[in-house]
């Protein structure tokens, strides 16, 4: 999504999951980075919420932090970050070709390009570094080289996306 500007520079905002990337990258990262045994063991602990989510009675913005905490709480950052590098490279090959070209066109025109996503920074920051674009997403908390299982920012979905965009960018500039 972008708005054409009369001031010669545009703010081009791209969503990730289901848009620039055709799949759910967060769930994909869980299966990429963690053992099946760990996923099953931790998944059983939050099974009622998973079921409620799939029955559309528990919202995604509540499910994501619960799932993140169950899967990554106490995980070693160096191990997960190495897997995130590999996963980011994998996702780069999965980008929607037409939208990726739009992104490149915006960069070529000198526009400010931003990825705005409810997914987590662990792998999205690496993707944005590779694409040389800015990132607004859900941050993850690290203490003593371990993921705490908590977010360092609110879940970046719905109204939070709008709030975070307006917080970081002066829309009058575009």
State the predicted function of each range:
Residues 2-56:
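Active-site neighborhood of HAD-like aspartate-dependent phosphohydrolases
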Residues 63-98:
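Metal-dependent phosphoesterase signature
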Residues 1-3, 9, 89-174:
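C-terminal cap/substrate-recognition subdomain and adjoining C-terminal extension
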Residues 51-77, 128-140:
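Short, compositionally biased "basic patch" segments
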Residues 18, 80, 117:
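Residue-level signature of catalytic and energy-coupling elements of molecular machines
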Residues 38-39, 58, 77-79, 97-98, ...:
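Conserved alpha/beta cores of soluble small-molecule-handling proteins
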Residues 26-27, 64, 162:
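A general structural signal for well-ordered alpha-helical segments in protein cores
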């Amino acid at each position: 999504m972008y708005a054409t500007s009369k001031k010669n520079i545009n703010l081009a905002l791209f969503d990730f999951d289901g848009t620039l990337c055709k799949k759910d990258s967060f769930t994909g990262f869980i299966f990429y980075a963690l053992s099946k045994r760990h996923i099953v063991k931790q998944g059983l602990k939050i099974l009622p919420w998973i079921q409620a989510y799939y029955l559309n009675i528990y919202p995604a913005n509540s499910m994501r932090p619960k799932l993140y905490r169950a899967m990554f709480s106490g995980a070693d950052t160096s191990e997960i970050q190495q897997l995130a590098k590999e996963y980011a490279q994998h996702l780069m090959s999965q980008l929607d070709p037409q939208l990726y070209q739009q992104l490149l066109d915006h960069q070529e025109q000198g526009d400010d390009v931003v990825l705005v996503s409810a997914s987590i920074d662990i792998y999205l920051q690496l993707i944005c570094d590779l694409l040389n674009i800015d990132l607004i997403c859900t941050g993850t908390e690290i203490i003593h080289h371990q993921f705490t299982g908590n977010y360092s920012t609110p879940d970046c979905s719905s109204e939070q996306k709008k709030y975070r965009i307006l917080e970081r960018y002066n829309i009058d500039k575009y």
